[in-house]
């Protein structure tokens, strides 16, 4: 394809932290280019999932192609690819950016630069994108445009002297953003090979069309009837239709080099078209795929069990359907003595886990119990083999374990200066080791290496509370480190409850065991017999509490009378309690399983 036909195409995405006004700016751009009529406009046009709307976050990538008549009289084709902003979805962001030549960096004029936008901006710069700074929310009384510019230059290190000040809410200066896109972001450059290469930016499942893939054609063209090959799996599929989003779905005869659009090829599930993969023609394939593709690895695991055992087949079906849209979700059947049948699910992070659980409950009307999330540990066995363990209940016997290694992450925290002491204290409590501190204007960048297990539970919430919401976090996995880890088991009346097992650092084992026993004591309802709650490491009991039995007053009917009569009744009651204790099962309520999650939140 010639460079002339590409000259008026601009592919760009928006990098922004959660709540900095990315989706609102996208709405304004769509409106200005006439993508939707005024009556069809609704807030957050591109966030199509109700959870995305409610939480004000973007989970899946979306795209929209818009014609724009610029001031120089030429019509440009703008392809805007929306990206998720949360740290859990950083791989999806890198794929969206790989499909662009430029990016708008949106910064809130009142809040300044946040860690997540820094991480994504570095990704954009590494991939050679032209980054255009945009300072949003200038209509706020607390907006400080000069400070925001200074922060962009100090923290990210790009020139912000010609940053565009806008208010996406009122629509002020949005036209200037479009002009900046046209004049500052370069058009796509033709590749040297003519063979088809298309990057899959995202895939989702449609009940009528099968998998719809959002693609950026790097070279060549795709048209209906072509036979495509997915390069990582080697499978072939016939194209049904191609087109673009305007943001409604519009069918086109072909997608050419430099364009971004959708492809349907009756693929049955998103694993057949993984994000970041390359599409090529089956009859005339490209010599090599586009760089950067990687399998998504779940980092956090939790058990999901239906409250009602009859819902198990429905849960399986719901997870199968969700997986069609969510390539990062992994699950396998699991049975637990305490909870019955369910699934062990793998997620990218805590936000991903919450969203999946919320979608299962809301869209499929399921009542679910989730166990405490755990990370994947590496276990070196005495025979020299290494296993990955995502469930504490599956830890091999102590005499077979040489060492346990936990995942370590590198966390970058950006915070205003006054909260630095609180944040360092929090990181030290979480067994972190400091890597460095950089002072960048009024912001401070603190780098720590932390055990992922400490971050998974409540680190993000605690970070927000010690910094009054101002600190922001970005993290990535670095390595596995060996340490003195033990498994704490909970025994109720001598029976081990596998769903409550935890893996903890030996120095924390006693404290966590005591806290867990105390918490369980509050949550397990009183029975007709004493319930012993114990925490154990191996065969050693490290903590114990007892839920006292309820007693019926068996002497109430004895008015006076011989003491032996009373003794007989009390003995009979005691005998009954003893028998009950032998056969009695203790029902453990749902809250007790969540106790593990809330232990640190006291």
Swiss-Prot record:
Q: Which residues form the tr-type G domain?
A: 7-189
Checking InterPro entries in the record gives: EF-4, EFG_III/V, EFG_V-like, EFTu-like_2, G_TR_CS, LepA_C_sf, LepA_CTD, LepA_IV
Query: How the protein sits in the membrane?
Result: Peripheral membrane protein
Its BP terms in the Gene Ontology are:
positive regulation of translation
Q: Report the catalytic activity.
A: GTP + H2O = GDP + phosphate + H(+)
Compartment list: Cell inner membrane
Any idea of its EC number?
Answer: 3.6.5.n1
Residues annotated as binding GTP are 19-24, 136-139
EC category name: hydrolase
- What protein is this chain from? Elongation factor 4
Q: Which organism is it from?
A: Stenotrophomonas maltophilia (strain K279a)
């Amino acid at each position: 394809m010639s460079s002339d036909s590409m000259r008026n195409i601009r592919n760009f995405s928006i990098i922004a932290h959660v709540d900095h006004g990315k989706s609102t700016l996208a709405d304004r751009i769509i409106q200005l280019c006439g993508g939707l009529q005024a009556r069809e406009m609704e807030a957050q046009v591109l966030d199509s999932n109700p959870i995305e709307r409610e939480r004000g976050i973007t989970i899946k990538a979306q795209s929209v192609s818009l014609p724009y008549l610029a001031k120089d009289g030429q019509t440009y084709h703008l392809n805007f690819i929306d990206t998720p902003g949360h740290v859990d979805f950083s791989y999806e962001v890198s794929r969206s950016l790989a499909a662009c030549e430029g990016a708008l960096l949106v910064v809130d004029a009142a809040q300044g630069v946040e860690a997540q936008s820094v991480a994504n901006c570095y990704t954009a710069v590494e991939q050679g994108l032209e980054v255009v700074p945009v300072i949003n929310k200038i209509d706020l009384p607390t907006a400080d445009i000069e400070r925001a510019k200074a922060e962009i230059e100090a923290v990210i290190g790009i020139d912000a002297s010609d940053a565009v000040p806008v208010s996406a809410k009122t629509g002020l200066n949005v036209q200037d953003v479009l002009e900046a896109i046209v004049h500052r972001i370069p058009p796509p450059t033709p590749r040297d090979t003519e063979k088809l290469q298309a990057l899959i930016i995202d895939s989702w499942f449609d009940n009528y069309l099968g998998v719809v893939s959002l693609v950026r054609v790097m070279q060549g063209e795709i048209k209906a009837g072509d036979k495509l090959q997915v390069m990582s799996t080697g499978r072939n599929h016939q194209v049904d239709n191609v087109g673009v989003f305007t943001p409604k779905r519009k069918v086109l005869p072909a997608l050419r080099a430099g364009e971004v659009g959708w492809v349907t090829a009756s693929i049955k599930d998103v694993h057949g078209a993984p994000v970041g993969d390359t599409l090529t023609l089956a009859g005339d394939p490209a010599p090599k795929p586009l760089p950067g593709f990687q399998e998504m690895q779940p980092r956090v695991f939790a058990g999901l069990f239906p409250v009602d055992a009859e819902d198990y087949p429905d849960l399986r079906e719901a997870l199968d359907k969700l997986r069609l849209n969510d390539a990062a979700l992994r699950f396998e059947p699991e049975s637990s003595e305490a909870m019955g049948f369910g699934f062990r699910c793998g997620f990218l992070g805590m936000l991903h886990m919450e969203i999946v659980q919320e979608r299962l409950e809301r869209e499929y009307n399921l009542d679910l119990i989730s166990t405490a999330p755990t990370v994947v540990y590496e276990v070196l066995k005495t025979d020299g083999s290494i296993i990955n363990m995502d469930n504490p209940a599956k830890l091999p016997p102590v005499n077979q374990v040489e060492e346990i290694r936990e995942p370590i992450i590198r966390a970058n925290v950006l915070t205003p200066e006054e909260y630095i002491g609180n944040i360092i204290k929090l990181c030290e409590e979480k067994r972190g080791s400091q890597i460095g501190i950089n002072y960048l204007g009024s912001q401070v960048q603190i780098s720590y290496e932390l055990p992922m297990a400490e971050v998974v539970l409540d680190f993000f919430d605690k970070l927000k509370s010690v910094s009054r919401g101002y600190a922001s976090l970005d993290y990535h996995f670095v390595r596995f480190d060996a340490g003195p880890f033990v498994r704490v088991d909970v025994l109720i009346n001598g029976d081990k409850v596998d769903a409550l097992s935890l893996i903890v650092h030996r120095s924390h084992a006693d404290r966590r065991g005591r806290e867990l026993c105390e918490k369980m004591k509050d949550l397990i309802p009183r029975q007709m017999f004493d319930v012993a709650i114990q925490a154990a490491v191996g065969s050693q009991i490290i903590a114990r509490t007892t839920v006292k039995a309820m007693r019926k007053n068996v002497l109430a009917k004895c008015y006076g009378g011989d003491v032996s009569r009373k003794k007989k009744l009390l003995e009979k009651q005691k005998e009954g309690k003893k028998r009950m204790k032998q056969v009695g099962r203790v029902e453990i309520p749902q809250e007790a399983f969540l106790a593990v999650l809330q232990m640190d939140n006291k």
